[in-house]
């Protein structure tokens, strides 16, 4: 993921637009657009220690780990 895919802040409306392919998702916060770009990338770096299932976002792993509470 690079500056080309993230875009830049506009001087008029402070929008950031995803430049990936034909996707034009727009947000005002850089961390939101970088989080969004993960939907375009097949990487899943957050792995569950209990079952090995992998997730793109740490918050998704955290939610998943709670399902193992009864294990």
From Swiss-Prot:
Q: Which GO terms describe its cellular component?
A: nucleus
Indicate yes or no for the key word DNA repair: no
Q: Which InterPro entries match?
A: pacC/RIM101, Znf_C2H2_sf, Znf_C2H2_type
Any one biological process term the GO annotation gives: positive regulation of transcription by RNA polymerase II
- C2H2-type ZnF: 16-40, 46-68
Query: Where in or outside the cell is it found?
Result: Nucleus
UniProt KW keywords: Activator, DNA-binding, Metal-binding, Nucleus, Repeat, Repressor, Transcription, Transcription regulation, Zinc, Zinc-finger
The record's annotation in Pfam families points to:
zf-C2H2
Q: What is its main location?
A: nucleus
Domain of life of the organism encoding this protein: Eukaryota
Instruction: Drop me one GO molecular function for this one.
Output: DNA binding
Q: Which family does it belong to?
A: Belongs to the pacC/RIM101 family.
According to its UniProt entry, the function of this protein is described as:
Transcription factor that mediates regulation of both acid- and alkaline-expressed genes in response to ambient pH. At alkaline ambient pH, activates transcription of alkaline-expressed genes (including pacC itself) and represses transcription of acid-expressed genes.
- PANTHER family hit by this protein: PH-RESPONSE TRANSCRIPTION FACTOR PACC/RIM101, PH-RESPONSE TRANSCRIPTION FACTOR PACC_RIM101
- The name of this protein is pH-response transcription factor pacC/RIM101
């Amino acid at each position: 993921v690079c500056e080309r895919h993230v875009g830049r802040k506009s001087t008029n409306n402070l929008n950031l637009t995803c430049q990936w392919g034909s996707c034009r998702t727009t947000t005002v916060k850089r961390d939101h657009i970088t989080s969004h770009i993960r939907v375009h990338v097949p990487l899943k770096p957050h792995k569950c220690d209990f079952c090995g299932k992998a997730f793109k976002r740490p918050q998704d792993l955290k939610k998943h780990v709670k399902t193992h509470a009864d294990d």
